[in-house]
Amino acid sequence: MGVETRRAIHAFVLLLGCSLSVSAQNWKQVGPPGGDVQSLAAVPGNTRTLFLGTSDGHVFGSRDGGDHWALLGRIGEHHDDVIMSMIVDPRSPNTLYATSWTLSSHGGGVYRSADAGHTWQLIGLEGLVVRAIAQAPSNPDILIAGATDGVYRSEDSGKRWFRISPEKHEDLRNFDSIAIDPHDPNTIYAGTYHLPWKTVDGGKNWASVHQGMVDDSDVMSITIDQNNASHVFASACSGIYHSPDGGANWTKFKGIPKDSRRTVHILQDPKRPATVYAATTEGLWKTSDDGANWRLITPVSWSILSMVIDPENSDRLILGTERLGIQMSDNGGETYRASNQGFSHRRIVDAAVDPQHPERAIVVLTSNFEPMLETKDAGRTWTPLATGLTSGPPRHIFASPDGWFAAPGPGGLLRYDSAKSSWMPVNQVTEKSAPTQSRNTASVKKVSTQSTNAPASKATATAMTKATAPFHAKVNDMAFGQNAWYAATEEGLFASRDHGLNWTRVALAPAQQGAAVSAVNSAAMRAVRISNGDSYVWALSSKQMEVSGDGGRTWMSRTLPFEPRGQLHLHPQDEKTVVLASDHGVFVSRDTGESWHQASLSELSIDDLAPVRNGVVVSTAKGSLFLSRDGGKTWGPMNGPDAEGSLSALRSREVGNQLVAASATEGLFVLEMGAASSASADSIPASPTAQQ
């Protein structure tokens, strides 16, 4: 539970003198499996025990060689620590070291865990970008870390650190890789953004060792042959290099295409020294003849971020990838299998669930390579749904009674055509008036003493023509009724009566002349909902709520009790009672929006809202959940899924009474609400203050 929530609940408890109990609820993680594996480490000599680090500070572990994974702990406080490297102390399988840098919180440094990854302590180089760490094989008390501003050394397992590279040196900075001679802890190689460097006296003196390398090479990895310390490998932007003489001279390997030259790691087979692997951003490459010939042994689309070779069975390869999680091979890279059970760490932007089929769900990811995944079997398998998407991951995804709808970022609306297995655009229909030819309205001549020829009068008839074009407005929300579907967009409210194929703008203001009417009809709409019988429709703009009690034919405007800055979510409890969730907390109206009462969650910023059977659930910006069973009058806290940070989406299914929560980084979770929705819990009453 976040600090924000604890403060709010503490204030309520002091005010009301009540104690809050939390009903036990069991959330089930259903995927999608995989994610970014930034770093991998194994207990030396035993790859049954593995650890992986992510790009947001999470540490997972496996005790069965990677077949099953569990979240162990987290590094940092703001969920933006990129765990660049991890090592396990050869003297103790419970002692781990990790280095990190942060995306925005000015953190980073060297961390240590003494309990196998469950808890972590910052032990040095606080606030620095630390991308590499190495432990001296001949003296494990010695640690060498490479940071943005230099190389640091510890001789007491990380208790104290001191700089061993010249301060403010023009080239000895921005370190990406560190390697220590297996027999001499004072012989150290360090790779920078600009070529490799070497010291043989523990850092007193440094020499640039780049003879034979392309100048200006960013050295990302350095590996020393454990059987022959003068035999060194290095990878750079310009390619992969080998030195037979301790870095004095380098020869570039041939055979790996230029496109795959960004090699993150080089690993030597512990049993076959002539076999070397190059983990690149475009697949894993292998040589069995000391670099004379190379071949690609994974799909080129795989980006390999980390790798471990089993020392007992060197045909067993464990790959940490971008997006795809852990991929394993038991035959030296001939075939692979995904091994992500318990590791679901995809970045979910939005999610939708089939309201009638508990086994169907879809998630939107941040990856352009794999922007959407669908499951039809409750998360056991996931299938990409990308065909027809032309602008990357959509902003939102919606579940209609007939299937999925996606709202692309630039605007527009797509429906998924399961027959064509593709996303298809929908149409916007506009009506325009067009004058017809003049016609005679008088055909009977009247004769009088004043006139002998009365001319026939003429009139201009107005006809309405329909024009069809691709739907282009940015969609913020959708609602699906029995007879009409609605889309709340940045350009107004739209309705469809043909299952979403064609959409027309809804006239919220009376049909009369004037710019004010046009402004109302085209105002940005943030949310929309429909009553069960389709008679009532609610649509929210940033300033007011539009209400229709006759299926959208006529509308009434209701003023909101605040000026929202962030998201708005709406839940009509019945035709009179409406729950409104926002960054100002929760408000309730029991007279169709004419007056509002602020609920007890006024101090919390609400991210999402989902109705459940006999209740409604809201999620806060910190990922906490609250449940109301009386239309928003009182609220009680719920246990959320075991995920840190915010929830990117909160959805519900009527069938099975399920609540579905999408974690921003830790996958999709499902809660059976049968017991939870009927259990009793102390609640937080609504505020007695009414706002008109």
Predicted regions and their residues:
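Extracellular glycan-interacting surfaces
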Residues: 12, 22-692
